[in-house]
């Protein structure tokens, strides 16, 4: 059983973040299904009623910041989707934190920081360690 209900990241600029995530989520089959003044919501095409990823203004009214030591791992269907996500992210202003490739554990993944510096790990289905 998957224990995660959804992921939420903070942003001070929903227009820029929406443009970024609209583009990078396309290879993962996630689309924006909600937009309010407070947040954007993204769902997978297989279950468009279930929002899995939110972009929000912080509820405390302070500036959005990234979490030091925090990482969000997203699962792609295959290597091609990992590469496409990474390429789109970089073209939309993300920071490279490790290009896609086979790692020491034998798995294929890469890392970017989004426009608000949240660390995103994009991976194909992994093998056990």
Sequence positions of predicted segments:
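Single conserved hydrophobic/aromatic residue that forms the stacking wall/gate
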Residues: 120-129
